[in-house]
């Protein structure tokens, strides 16, 4: 009888410990993304049918512990028109409270995207183009888990044409 009671108590203790670990994972804050003020996003023509977009992004870890930025899956919008999908394995280590500037490069094809005709004209005319990157971000926080945050707007701003 004592053995069964001990096993039941141990099982209850382990269940509470597992529940505690899940609540610890909920304490992880998502990394923050922002356009780098002195490095505007760039669009470069890639022939007549497309362009390359480089988003200079500052990624900040708001947590009091280090983590690894694992994945970024998103959708790029140019002037509110769907322009491209992106899926990056990043592997960027961010220390507690630290930040890093990374370029996010995305290729856009005008051939398959009729909604981008106006965007193409703005690019050819070397006019600024508004962008936003929406998506999800996966992090590896070691024993605290591997949460995925989003969907959310990761970064937005205006591009310059080079």
Regions found by a protein language model. Give the residues of each.
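Intrinsically disordered, low-complexity Pro/Gly/Ser/Thr-rich segments with frequent PxxP/GP/PP motifs
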Residues: 80-115
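Bacterial Sec signal peptide processing site at the extreme N-terminus
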Residues: 12-36
């Amino acid at each position: 009888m004592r053995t069964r009671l001990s096993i039941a108590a141990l099982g209850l203790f382990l269940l509470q410990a597992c529940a505690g670990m899940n609540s610890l994972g909920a304490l992880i804050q998502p990394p923050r993304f922002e356009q780098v003020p002195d490095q505007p996003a760039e669009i470069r023509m890639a022939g007549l049918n497309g362009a390359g977009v480089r988003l200079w992004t500052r990624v900040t870890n708001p947590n009091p512990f280090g983590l690894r930025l694992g994945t970024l899956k998103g959708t790029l919008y140019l002037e509110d028109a769907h322009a491209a999908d992106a899926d990056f394995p990043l592997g960027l280590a961010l220390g507690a409270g630290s930040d890093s500037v990374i370029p996010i490069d995305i290729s856009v094809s005008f051939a398959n995207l009729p909604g981008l005709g106006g965007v193409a004209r703005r690019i050819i005319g070397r006019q600024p183009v508004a962008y936003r990157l929406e998506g999800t971000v996966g992090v590896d926080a070691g024993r605290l888990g591997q949460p995925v945050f989003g969907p959310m707007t990761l970064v937005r701003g205006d591009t310059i044409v080079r």
